[in-house]
Each structure stands twice: as structure tokens, then as C-alpha cells.
A protein has these predicted regions:
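Formylglycine-dependent sulfatase
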Residues: 1-273
Length: 273
């Protein structure tokens, strides 16, 4: 819908929109002008450029092998860093189109395999974390650095004041045998984690930056669901008339951002098949 309304649309990172060999496996068939490393898989075969991100040149690569980053194969670069570099290049190209841009930056981190980002690993070991938790922490910090790098890019190119930034996660943190500690404490003070209907599984972070509209250091405790982003982003972009094949379940939460108006009340539930 954004592409049809004049936006240059960029996907970077994890797609996982549809199964392999279906149209949904390819972000270019889902409305994006640019696809960087997105395909059917929801996790990478490897986060390491030295391991070709799981690709096996000359052999059959696993489904989770990350596509499209061949320039980094055999190099000492972590996936989160490579994606950030490519996202900035895509933004450079977007600025030459004289169109507004939409960047969907979806890191493969923080997802299994829990592999350490060596840029940050040693300091977490020095803090006394067990190796698996130290590795988990590096995935978080790598994503945090990526966000900071992209925000620096916006500042450097005088785009910050005219850019809306929405940061969120699709589920709670991992709570599984692949992590250290008891399952019910891994997202403390919330119970359980990803795949659970407890708060550790369904309560996610969200941060919004919109200079001149969203007041800094304000908080909102109203609950949202991921479907709410679709109508809200279109409202922010000024798209008023559009049709979709699917039923639209989301509610525009722009009133919460502007402080003008309220969200309608609704019941919420989670189904985990």
C-alpha cells in the first residue's frame, strides 16, 4: 500500500512472511522495492560472515542460510552489522529517488542460534555471565548498536526531524533449555517467555521517536497488538484510501502518539496453535 502511494519501500533482514516456495517467501512480491537478506526462514543458519551465514558454496545450503550477502562471505563480520551497513546503503539510494522512504528493519537477532557477537562478548563474560547468557546479551547489544547507527545516519543526513521511528519486538524473550537459569525467570520480572501466554511471552518493548509530535520521555501503558501498526503507519503516511484482500483487524493508535483522543476499548486474547 505504501509503495502504491509513492513510497520507496525497503526490507532489510528477517522476513519470514510466508513458507518456502510461496509468494510470501519473497519480500519483493510483498510490496517492497528492495529486499536485503529476507526470505522464508525465521532464523539464520549462522550469524557469522566467516561461515557464509550458513551458505555452502558448491553444495546444498540449508533453508535457513541467509541469502544475498555474498560480499560478506568469508569475512569477519556479524550478521547484525552487515545488515546495518546494507540498510544505510539502501537509504542512500532511497534519497536519490525524491520519494519518501519506508524502511522495515527486521534483525535476525535475537533468535537462535545463540551465537556470540564477538565485538561485545568478553565484557559480559567478565561480568560473570555464563557463556550462553553472555552470547544472548551480545545479540541484544548488537541490535542496539544497529539502531544507534541508523539514528546517527538520520542525524548526519538531516532526516531525523522528518522521520518517524517505531521500535518493537514480535514476541517476548527466549525462555528455553538453550538459555541458562530456570525457565520462569529468564525474562524476570515477567513470567515465562516466547510461545507463552504469560507476560514474558506477549509483553514486548516499544519505543517511538517522532520529533515535534511525540513528547520525549513520555510513557503510555495502553496495550497494542502488531496488527495495529498497519493502519497507524498508513495514517502517519497520509494514505487515506486503500483496499486490502484481507480483513483488517488493527486499530489506528495515532491518538496515543499525539495525545489527542483515545483508543477504543477491546478484548484481547492469544491463540498459540
Amino acid at each position: 500500500v505504501l509503495k502504491d502511494n509513492g513510497y520507496h519501500t525497503i526490507h532489510c533482514g528477517k522476513a519470514h512472511f510466508g513458507a518456502n516456495d510461496t509468494p510470501g517467501a519473497d519480500p519483493l512480491k510483498m510490496g517492497f522495492d528492495v529486499n536485503i537478506a529476507g526470505h522464508a526462514a525465521g532464523s539464520p543458519a549462522s550469524y557469522y560472515g566467516m561461515q557464509n551465514f550458513g551458505n555452502k558454496p558448491g553444495g546444498k545450503s540449508p533453508l535457513a542460510a541467509v541469502p544475498g550477502l555474498e560480499k560478506y562471505h568469508g569475512k569477519d563480520v556479524f550478521l547484525s552489522e552487515a545488515l546495518t551497513i546494507e540498510a544505510e546503503k539502501a537509504l542512500d539510494n532511497a534519497r536519490t529517488t525524491d520519494k519518501p522512504f519506508f524502511l522495515y528493519m527486521a534483525h535476525y537477532a535475537i533468535h537462535t542460534p545463540i551465537q556470540p557477537d564477538m565485538r561485545f562478548y568478553q565484557k559480559y563474560l567478565d561480568k560473570g555471565l555464563p557463556p550462553i547468557e553472555a552470547a544472548y546479551a551480545t545479540l541484544i547489544e548488537g541490535m542496539d548498536k544497529s539502531l544507534g547507527d541508523l539514528m546517527d545516519y538520520l542525524d548526519k543526513n538531516n532526516l531525523t526531524d522528518n522521520t518517524v521511528l517505531l521500535f518493537m519486538s514480535d514476541n517476548g524473550g527466549l525462555a528455553a533449555h538453550t538459555r541458562a537459569g530456570e525457565l520462569h525467570t529468564q525474562n524476570y520480572p515477567l513470567n515465562s517467555g516466547k510461545g507463552s501466554a504469560y507476560e514474558g511471552g506477549v509483553r514486548e518493548p516499544m519505543i517511538v521517536s517522532w520529533p515535534g509530535v511525540v513528547a520525549a520521555e513520555t510513557k503510555c501503558d495502553h496495550y497494542l497488538m502488531i496488527e495495529d501498526f498497519f493502519p497507524t503507519i498508513l495514517e502517519i503516511a497520509g494514505v487515506e484510501h486503500y483496499n486490502t484482500v484481507q480483513k483488517r483487524d488493527g486499530i489506528n493508535f495515532l491518538p496515543l502518539l499525539t495525545g489527542k483522543g483515545k483508543m477504543p476499548a477491546r478484548d484481547i486474547y492469544w491463540h498459540y496453535p
